[in-house]
């Protein structure tokens, strides 16, 4: 069967959307788009306009108010009412989207709209709601990688989406067999924010035809935009909810409004439960018969992270209360339909102020409980239940309690909340790419067999803690972590947590790290945190210290490292600072290893945390919660969460995964074996060699299709290498995998050269190439130790007296530059080469290499600006002003740019603007580090 062309796919979709209820209209350019918008605006506001449609002046006045805004501001205008002054000085309010009666909006569809701004573009399918282009569909023919459609959207958005196209809320991309949707934003569009649509049972709806049938029906689409897109006020971005979040909210609302029963939602850790539960709370708080919605969290969870998250979804959602009287006032305030508080504070309010809350014995109240397995097993829940007689309770959890892992009183989650309203399990989340799978290692630290703390088959008198914490074993584990940490964390690009069995163990490990760290060329940044008891049991004098003393030392070490001023009197502030620190990326000063007992193992999210070291016993929900700290999606260089167990937790891991994925097949959750990846590598390597037998033959490829085949083949190989490197048995040798590291570096250099070539061609020419939208996944190629700082360190070590040694240093730098994969370093490559070839040989031992390089860069930058300005006949100082603005804002000032270019013919003006924007962006990156 011949493949379906892009044109045929587009035509098929247009026909289907027409059948679903969209009016098919012909809109070919921006003028027709504005005319159509104006017509519908007049129709929808006929009553308010009283038979007098908007005049040209009035419409122009409106466009001035709504045009030229950011995507974020446009999204707010779309959902708001806008006052418009008429020519007779009267005022009317215009609305652009009916966010409550979704079906009352006007739905149209058009295709092949042409726009011409900096670049020409023609869009595939545009969905108009009330005349505004709110959804843009970009299609690729079957067999083309869907990421190419994503990259095309990124290109269009950067180059073409202006005017009313700033109101696009959502993009849909498809190649016919695979379909995704994602929200529009001012900031960089991320692949991790592309979502699959699915049915209520989490079965993926992939084909474009099925997707349109389920997702794109007019009322459903308006509902998605109105109800299930969130305006994140803190980050100033639009967020689209995922299908399982939508279904959970719908099920909960139905249960709350149509029955008097309780229920719970089981969504795996890391799947965005906070957003789901908050959205449900928000919608329920708008119901007339529900007097109050109370969002309950556990005390330890209402930290800065939770407050931050809630306030993102609705500004001012969390009014932090420091005493129960404030909470009582909030409960009695009818203007506050939604309250966020802790279970502990609520129980206290009832105990001391029950007479002030009498109305709640009859008023309907809905409690939404986040992470209900932590906060709802206990006396406080019973106390709240006794007072709020007409209340419904809805729990959210990632790890429910079942008979095998029930609470201390034997109750399960179902015993407390009743029916499970919706599930989204860890296997579903991994399949959809919403969380990562796990790579789990078990390191045996005993010669005979792995010992378990509860293992009584050993000699009965054995002191198991003494065995686990024997000096020799603690040092063995610590050395293993030190020796492998860089490999596990991709040269410290990521952070890690080390969880141990007790405070005593934490202190011992911290002190061992501190001692061994002194011998390292690049010491690890290790921090520790725990909660001490004021009156501690000294275990019959066995422990010769109070744990507070040891924590004080850890905090003092931390203060020296990070220039802070914490103490054991300010442990909350210390906790919050550590929390932010573990979330920092590679370029920031950060913690490499955080040692904990239980803290940070639940409810803590950090995308840059990828490794968990374990030296304690974990089971069921505790195990899954701890493992899940590592599996937040970040970028291509983080393919899984790495778990390193120093105890034999194989059975516990399998049992936990079986319970929480509801399957005996754990292969979808755990990484495959080394041998499987090795076989996959050999097949991919063979395929690469068939396309280009040697790296230098890449230079001979003339055909773009062939070059694309090379890029795709090497990209696949690089992905497999990334996974192989996680295994201890991996060796990058010909004997082991048929390829050595040098050959891989040579292929990688050619791959990056193609990337540079495409990037340069895209910036310089208005030319469409099949390589323009290919996904190079550059982050995956990076080796974060080989960057600009690394090269500068080598430069500083150049021996300026010994010329022979100097030549060796220069040659070393040249070799490194030839294989550079850091983007900034690749930009500086020619500069550094010129510096070591022309400047270094003339230096003497008294010269400061750092200062000499700064001077050299300054001269080169000055020459580059002078040359570009002269070549283009533009003002050099004005160019520098634009560059300085860009350095701080990341945006080329359009007013300054327009003034600089002056009056040129349209085509020349477009060409000049593009050249200046490219020059400013590249020189800023090149000279900015």
From Swiss-Prot:
Family matches, as InterPro entries? Helicase_ATP-bd, HsdR_RecA-like_helicase_dom_2, P-loop_NTPase, Restrct_endonuc_type1_HsdR_N, Restrct_endonuc_typeI_HsdR, SWI2_SNF2, Type-I_R_enzyme_R_subunit, TypeI_RM_Rsu_C
SMART domains, per database record? DEXDc
Which residues are noted in the entry as ATP-binding?
268-274
Q: What is its EC number?
A: 3.1.21.3
Q: Which Pfam families match?
A: EcoR124_C, HSDR_N, SWI2_SNF2, T1R_D3-like
Family matches, as Gene3D superfamilies: 1.20.58.2040, 3.90.1570.50, P-loop containing nucleotide triphosphate hydrolases
Enzyme's top EC category: hydrolase
UniProt GO BP:
DNA restriction-modification system
Q: Which UniProt keywords apply?
A: ATP-binding, DNA-binding, Endonuclease, Hydrolase, Nuclease, Nucleotide-binding, Restriction system
Q: Report which superkingdom the organism of origin falls in.
A: Bacteria
The Helicase ATP-binding domain sits at 254-418
Task of the protein? The restriction (R) subunit of a type I restriction enzyme that recognizes an undetermined sequence and cleaves a random distance away. Subunit R is required for both nuclease and ATPase activities, but not for modification. After locating a non-methylated recognition site, the enzyme complex serves as a molecular motor that translocates DNA in an ATP-dependent manner until a collision occurs that triggers cleavage.
Family named by the database record: Belongs to the HsdR family.
Under which name does UniProt file this protein? Type I restriction enzyme SauMRSORF196P endonuclease subunit
From what organism does this protein derive?
Answer: Staphylococcus aureus (strain MRSA252)
Q: Which gene encodes it?
A: hsdR
């Amino acid at each position: 069967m011949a493949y379906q062309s892009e044109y045929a796919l587009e035509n098929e979709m247009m026909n289907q959307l027409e059948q679903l209820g969209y009016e098919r209209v012909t809109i070919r350019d921006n003028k027709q788009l504005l005319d159509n918008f104006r017509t519908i605006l007049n129709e929808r506001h006929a009553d308010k306009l009283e038979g007098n449609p908007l005049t040209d002046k009035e419409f122009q006045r409106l466009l001035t108010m709504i045009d030229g805004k950011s995507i974020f501001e446009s999204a707010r205008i779309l959902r708001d009412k806008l006052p418009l002054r008429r020519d007779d000085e009267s005022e009317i309010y215009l609305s652009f989207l009916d966010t409550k009666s979704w079906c009352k909006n006007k739905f149209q569809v058009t295709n092949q709209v042409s726009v011409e701004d900096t670049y020409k573009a023609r869009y595939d399918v545009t969905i108009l709601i009330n005349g505004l282009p709110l959804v843009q569909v970009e299609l690729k023919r079957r067999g083309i990688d869907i990421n190419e459609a994503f990259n095309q959207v990124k290109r269009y958005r950067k180059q073409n989406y202006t005017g009313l196209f700033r109101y696009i809320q959502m993009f849909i991309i498809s190649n016919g067999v695979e379909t995704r949707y994602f929200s529009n934003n001012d900031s960089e569009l991320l692949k991790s924010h592309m979502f699959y649509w699915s049915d209520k049972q989490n079965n993926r709806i992939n084909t474009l035809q099925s997707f349109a049938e389920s997702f794109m029906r007019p009322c459903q689409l308006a509902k998605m935009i109105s109800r299930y897109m969130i305006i994140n006020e803190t980050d100033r971005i639009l967020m689209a909810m995922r299908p399982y979040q939508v279904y959970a909210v719908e099920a909960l609302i139905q249960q709350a409004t149509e029955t008097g029963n309780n229920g719970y939602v089981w969504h795996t850790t890391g799947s965005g439960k906070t957003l789901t539960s908050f959205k449900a709370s928000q919608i329920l708080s708008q119901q007339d018969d529900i007097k109050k919605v109370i969002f309950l969290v556990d005390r330890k969870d209402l930290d800065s992270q939770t407050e931050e998250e809630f306030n993102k979804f609705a500004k001012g959602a969390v009014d932090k209360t420091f005493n129960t009287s404030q909470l009582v006032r909030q409960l009695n305030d009818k203007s506050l339909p939604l309250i966020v508080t802790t279970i502990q504070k609520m129980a206290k309010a009832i105990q001391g102020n029950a007479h002030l809350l009498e109305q709640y014995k009859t008023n309907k109240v809905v409690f939404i409980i986040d992470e209900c397995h932590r906060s709802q097993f206990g006396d406080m829940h019973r106390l709240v239940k006794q007072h709020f007689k007409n209340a419904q309770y809805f729990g959210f959890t990632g790890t429910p309690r079942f008979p095998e892992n029930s609470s201390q009183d034997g109750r399960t989650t179902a015993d407390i909340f009743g029916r499970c309203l919706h599930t989204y399990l860890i296997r579903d989340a991994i399949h959809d790419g919403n969380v990562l799978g796990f790579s789990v290692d078990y390191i045996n630290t005993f010669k005979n067999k792995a010992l378990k703390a509860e293992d009584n088959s050993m000699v009965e008198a054995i002191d198991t803690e003494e065995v686990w914490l024997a000096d020799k074993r603690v040092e063995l584990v610590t050395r293993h972590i030190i020796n492998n940490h860089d490999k596990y964390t991709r040269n410290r690009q990521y952070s890690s947590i080390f969880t141990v069995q007790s405070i005593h163990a934490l202190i011992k490990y911290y002190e061992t790290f501190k001692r061994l760290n002194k011998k390292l060329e690049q010491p690890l940044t290790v921090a520790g945190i725990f909660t001490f008891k004021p009156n501690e049991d000294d275990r019959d004098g066995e422990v010769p210290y109070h744990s507070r003393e040891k924590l004080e030392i850890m905090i003092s070490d931390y203060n020296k490292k990070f220039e802070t001023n914490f103490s054991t009197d300010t442990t909350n502030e210390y906790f919050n600072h550590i929390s932010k620190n573990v979330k920092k990326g590679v370029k920031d000063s950060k913690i490499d290893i955080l040692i904990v007992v239980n803290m940070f193992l639940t409810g803590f999210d950090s995308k840059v945390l990828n490794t968990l070291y374990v030296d304690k016993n974990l089971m069921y929900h505790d195990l899954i919660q701890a493992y899940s700290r590592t599996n937040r999606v970040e970028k291509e260089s983080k393919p899984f969460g790495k778990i390193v167990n120093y105890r034999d937790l194989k059975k516990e891991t399998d049992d936990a995964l079986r319970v929480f994925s509801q399957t005996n097949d754990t292969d979808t959750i755990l990484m495959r074996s080394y041998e499987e990846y090795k076989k996959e590598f050999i097949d991919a390597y063979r395929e690469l060699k068939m396309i280009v037998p040697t790296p230098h033959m890449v230079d001979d490829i003339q055909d773009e299709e062939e070059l694309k085949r090379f890029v795709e083949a090497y990209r696949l190989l690089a992905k497999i290498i990334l996974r192989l490197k996680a295994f201890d048995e991996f060796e990058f040798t010909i004997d082991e995998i048929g390829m050595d590291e040098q050959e891989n570096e040579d292929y990688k250099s050619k791959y990056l050269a193609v990337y540079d070539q495409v990037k340069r061609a895209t910036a310089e020419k208005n030319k469409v190439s099949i390589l323009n939208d290919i996904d190079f996944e550059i982050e995956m190629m990076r080796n974060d130790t080989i960057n600009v700082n690394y090269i500068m360190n080598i430069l500083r070590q150049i021996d300026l007296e010994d010329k022979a040694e100097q030549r060796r240093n220069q040659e070393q730098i040249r070799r490194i530059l030839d294989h550079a994969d850091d983007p900034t370093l690749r930009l500086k490559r020619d500069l550094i080469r010129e510096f070591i070839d022309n400047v270094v040989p003339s230096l003497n031992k008294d010269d400061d290499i750092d200062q000499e390089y700064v001077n050299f860069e300054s001269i080169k930058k000055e020459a580059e600006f002078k040359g570009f300005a002269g070549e283009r006949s533009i003002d050099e100082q004005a160019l520098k002003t634009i560059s300085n603005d860009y350095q701080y804002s990341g945006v080329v000032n359009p007013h300054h740019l327009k003034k600089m270019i002056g009056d040129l013919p349209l085509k020349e003006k477009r060409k000049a603007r593009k050249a200046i924007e490219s020059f400013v962006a590249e020189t800023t990156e090149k000279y900015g580090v």
